[in-house]
Amino acid sequence: MSRIGKMPVQLADQAKIEIKDNVITVSGPKGTLQQQLVPEVSVDIADGQITVTRADDTKRSRAMHGLYRMLVSNMVDGVTKGFTRKLLISGVGFRAEMKSDLLALTLGYSHQIYFKAPEEVTIACPDPTTIEISGIDKALVGQVAAKIRSFRKPEPYRGKGIKFSDEVVRRKEGKTAGKK
């Protein structure tokens, strides 16, 4: 049995869960999330705990078992607490600012990059070198953060670029002058 899949998910006090027509809906103070279930797994609610069980023991069923347990867990966490990713910008003249609903990035190119976030995600710039992305859908928050990072990934020689706050950039040593 999947080690992750067999652990029950604790249902938070503020969260409400509903299963109808193979669609699981979790709602809470921050919003509502829905997820389509695959036929290999089923979800049961009892005593404030959500358990995910699988139909058979095939390889796909075992994979879906752990996956859907974590998806349900992330949905419960998202509608109660929410998720946040933090990006750090390093480099001379590199900065970010919010212009109405657009994120304006100055990253050393000949032009500014404007990024419009999806409606489910909020972006904030507490200072010009920090970007905070928050929302209730963990996958969408991570996807938006990865898209912003892709505009200028950190380079290994000086570390200039956009990186996640918990990311460690592997640095390389530059060329050294040799004897002729």
Curated annotation (Swiss-Prot):
One of its GO terms (biological process) is cytoplasmic translation. One of its GO terms (cellular component) is cytosolic large ribosomal subunit. InterPro entries: Ribosomal_uL6-like, Ribosomal_uL6-like_a/b-dom_sf, Ribosomal_uL6_a/b-dom, Ribosomal_uL6_bac-type. It comes from the Bacteria. Keywords: Ribonucleoprotein, Ribosomal protein, RNA-binding, rRNA-binding. GO terms for molecular function: rRNA binding; structural constituent of ribosome. Belongs to the universal ribosomal protein uL6 family. This protein binds to the 23S rRNA, and is important in its secondary structure. It is located near the subunit interface in the base of the L7/L12 stalk, and near the tRNA binding site of the peptidyltransferase center. Part of the 50S ribosomal subunit. This is Large ribosomal subunit protein uL6. The lineage of its organism: Bacteria, Pseudomonadati, Chlorobiota, Chlorobiia, Chlorobiales.
